[in-house]
Amino acid sequence: SAGYVAMGLALNGGKPAAVCCTSGTALLNLHPAVAEAYYQQIPLVVISGDRPASAVGQMMGQTIPQPNVFQSLVKMSVTLPEVKDDNDDWYCNRLINEALLELYHNGRGHVHINVPISEPLFDFTTEELPEVRVINRYEGLNEYNNNFEEIFAKINLFTQRMVIAGQELMIYQFDDAVNQRMNRHFVWFSEYLANQTTPSKCITNFDAILYTLTEEEQKKYSPDFLLTFGGHVVSKRVKQFLKKYPPKEHWHVASDGAIVDTYGCLTKVFQVSVFEFLDRFTSYLMAKENTPYLRFWEMKSKQIPEPQLDYSSVGVVGSLIRKIAPDSVLHLANSSVVRYAQLFKIPRKVEVCCNRGTAGIEGSLSTAIGYAHLSDKL
């Protein structure tokens, strides 16, 4: 009956309620309440203790397969890792945030958080729980539930602001007025895979810049605010840089609202078109001159020359890029080819495509053939 009691609490208070249980069949006893909560769309959080995965099927007490035990009756089911290092800690935090955010994502519902615990089970020595990261998600920019004026105004508290644009299709382009406002306030990092969803002044050779920076420079010129949008970013170096020197705030804009924590420091997700977001967001930016932070990255970018390596794969990529005609389409294979391309200037109207979803090189030529079949472009 504990599940029904929790359901009643959620019904009466209008807020999520949690029910906790031990491992084994104690979890199955909650099944009827979980089914009822599913059809009433009640925000219920089921938290179950569990034995380690290695104990399942080994005649250990109170042990059954618990991950995803409720299947389609919950909006999300997560099994937390047993935290042994920083990566486990990040993963655990991310999963809990994902589960709790799903309670009200695209409608109400309930979630299951499964918590494996190894022996000893009764040795609790922590006197005070630590502060943990909380990720917030905003579905649209409706003022009914959120004060976006207050949220967006906070951006002016930060002085070292950066945007990273991920892979996007060529058909998506920003208004010039938005580009100009963002240019005055943000350092833009972009690979060519982002196409024209970035201003003409964006920094494309950032991977090479990071390679030249000292540890002191990396720390000093790391962003305190990061804004991201789009799909995949190839550069491992920028991911390592931001994980080592994380910003105080990382906002990600995605039309599906997915929790994608590429840099390990995500704090807010805006489920909205990036065009709608930036049109609204930039109106809150206070007028400023070009800051030392922007000037540093622009200077470093200009100091990196195009490589002159004739007898190498880098040289081959460079020689091909120099011959590309404007308004053509460039299909890149993956990984190293994308990184090499970043070292050269590609005409702005060239569309760049790459099968970066799975980061595999198979199908690159076939994709280019399929594209060319319906295109008049070179």
What kind of region is each of these model predictions?
Residues N29, A165-W251, P347-K377:
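Glycine-rich, anion-gripping cofactor-binding loops and their flanking helix/strand elements
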